[in-house]
Amino acid sequence: MELSRRICLVRLWLLLLSFLLGFSAGSALNWREQEGKEVWDYVTVREDARMFWWLYYATNPCKNFSELPLVMWLQGGPGGSSTGFGNFEEIGPLDTRLKPRNTTWLQWASLLFVDNPVGTGFSYVNTTDAYAKDLDTVASDMMVLLKSFFDCHKEFQTVPFYIFSESYGGKMAAGISLELHKAIQQGTIKCNFSGVALGDSWISPVDSVLSWGPYLYSVSLLDNKGLAEVSDIAEQVLNAVNKGFYKEATQLWGKAEMIIEKNTDGVNFYNILTKSTPDTSMESSLEFFRSPLVRLCQRHVRHLQGDALSQLMNGPIKKKLKIIPDDVSWGAQSSSVFISMEEDFMKPVIDIVDTLLELGVNVTVYNGQLDLIVDTIGQESWVQKLKWPQLSRFNQLKWKALYTNPKSSETSAFVKSYENLAFYWILKAGHMVPADQGDMALKMMRLVTQQE
């Protein structure tokens, strides 16, 4: 046992040394790709539509990557980049300053970042008609990519494969998971699909919108008058959704957010304990005031590609990858990705989650305590609408407290799990759980992937 422990420590030291030696001082990025540690490529998913992916092999010093799961991370928006934000701001091996991240998931899983839908991050389209306009197209494109990936990387075909997601990425993950299950059953894709995790996910938009008023009122961010205003616009959103007027519902959703901003003095939709930091240059433009979609895009996509991250991705990272076309800039098409999905925003996918549960797919829902845009109350609301036969038994269970380590006395989360449904309440976290509570997010990932 002592010899094994020493070997692990030596391997870990060598691994950290190899990472550090790969960087020069300052912001320049000139590390050498380590054999078998990282690979990336494009896949043509449709005519005029190319999707970019980036794979990191797990770096656990005591285990081979084949002994650990493969996790695909899907960012939100739509239009948020997994290879950028998810990688360098949340779970990847390095942060935006290219410093090692202590809570990287790469210790316990190989990580596959995909810029999805097409037009996101380094993915791109050659014509405007090639942007995805609905979840069906998003899922179909991903099937093309996953088939290509698993066909080319057969070493991952038997490794447990999990899809983790965030925000709108969760809505896409639900649809992708269902299509992936079908493809596996039909034999068109070979992989060991083991579950999907929906993080602060836009599964039932109207349930989120309806919960905003009561949630903000309960934490003293709305008074009676403000609650009445928010509740009124939320009912208008509900009516539009019930009538199938999804584009109108999207416009009303944008209006609801403006009403909340005015009544809360600019609460941050991603963490209620902070205030939003608007882009004043954007807000001074005529387009910003005329278009609710532009305002929504400003709030829900542009914050995923701040100046530091954009400079990193379009500078050192683009130079490292070598395969990005000269005329493609990271994040340049993200606004078009967002706007193209306008009619899809407010459509619920509770039925898809229900189908996944019925098929026996492991489904995990996790949510940050301080999130507003997809608050926990709204998540709990749509979960209670599931037709899954085991829901009553799930509800009868008492949740269990979780701690980041055995010696900690501070509660970091709660979890409830029955058969193939689990729900995690992550404390002191906003919308981006791994960014806010990295240790707990890592522990949760290990629990979901059955490593704890």
Curated annotation (Swiss-Prot):
- Per its UniProt entry, which superkingdom is the organism in? Eukaryota
Active site (catalytic residues): 167, 371, 431
> What family does this belong to?
Belongs to the peptidase S10 family.
- Protein name per its UniProtKB record: Retinoid-inducible serine carboxypeptidase
Q: Where is the signal peptide?
A: 1-28
Major site of localization recorded for this protein: secreted
Q: In which tissues is it expressed?
A: Highly expressed in aorta, bladder, and kidney with much lower levels in all other tissues analyzed. Expression in kidney is restricted to proximal convoluted tubules.
Any single GO CC term annotated in Swiss-Prot or TrEMBL for this entry: extracellular region
Q: Which residues form a coiled coil?
A: none
State the organism of origin. Answer: Rattus norvegicus
Q: Which Gene3D superfamilies match?
A: alpha/beta hydrolase
> Could you say which enzyme class this protein belongs to?
hydrolase
Q: Name one Pfam family in it.
A: Peptidase_S10
UniProt-listed PROSITE patterns: CARBOXYPEPT_SER_SER
Quote the EC number: 3.4.16.-
